[in-house]
Amino acid sequence: THLSTIFTENRLKKYIELRSMDTCGWDCLCSGPAFYIGMLYGNLDEVYEIISKWDNNKIINAYLEAPQKGFNTQLMGKDLLHWASILLDISKKGLENRDILNKRGKNESLFLNHLQKVIDNKLTNADHMVGKFSISEDLSELYDK
């Protein structure tokens, strides 16, 4: 059907289908799937303990604000960088515990390296793209008002 061509952020079928990250280079292609796998095979109770306290309206507001504010977007009184760091740690533990190794003996947590760099540098892919513009350039026209 034509409805199957609609690709929202995620779709629930006989499996969960997630949209990949946008503006993603080769170094981060596997980061998104690895992040979710790490949480699913990690401590779901720990993740649930965190997100169960989040208000649905605040989640939607953060989702809508994130393209403009990036890591400075607030969710439940903390910025997204805070939440990203916590959830990435949980995901990393999940992948380490899963202990699936490559030929070099490294576990799947290596796929999270790109996300860890983003958090450590506090710069998103969008921040890097905006950084290519002149400091004096007014980028507000890029956003709907």
Task: Label the predicted regions.
Residues 1-145:
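C-terminal accessory/tail domains of diverse enzymes
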